[in-house]
């Protein structure tokens, strides 16, 4: 599972998910991509399960890029704990995703295979997504 080696702060604020993504919205590495249409937190487990699906389709012929990284720790308190006594301990890591962000990119496979692969990976995501192709610049 993905997680940072070290962070500046152990227990950050939750933040909000307003607005659209302004960076990471265009395909930068591959030919085809999976783009988020809704805001959410995507856990490192969800990212990993999507990666496994895509590597099965891509095999050795293609290449895969994961464009999001879970860098935000989510804290939880033990069940049955009374109110107060501070913030909980980090339980898992999430990537903050805004609408328009590219999640995965692939290349080296045909378009129907890429479409099927990214559709299968989209089932693993907790949000609506869409298949995007690289724009050909004239």
Curated annotation (Swiss-Prot):
The protein's UniProt keywords, in alphabetical order, are: Chloroplast, Plastid, Ribonucleoprotein, Ribosomal protein
* GO MF annotations, alphabetized: rRNA binding; structural constituent of ribosome
Can you state the subunit structure given in the record?
Part of the 50S ribosomal subunit.
SUPFAM superfamilies assigned: Ribosomal protein L16p/L10e (SSF54686)
Q: Where in the cell is it found?
A: Plastid, Chloroplast
For this chain, the family text in UniProt reads: Belongs to the universal ribosomal protein uL16 family.
Q: What is its main location?
A: plastid
Q: Which organism is it from?
A: Tetradesmus obliquus
Q: Name one GO cellular component term.
A: chloroplast
Q: Which GO annotations describe the biological process of this protein? A: mitochondrial translation
Q: Which PANTHER family match?
A: 50S/60S RIBOSOMAL PROTEIN L16, LARGE RIBOSOMAL SUBUNIT PROTEIN UL16M
Indicate what this protein is called per its UniProt record: Large ribosomal subunit protein uL16c
Coiled-coil regions in this chain?
A: none
Tell me which HAMAP family the record gives. Ribosomal_uL16
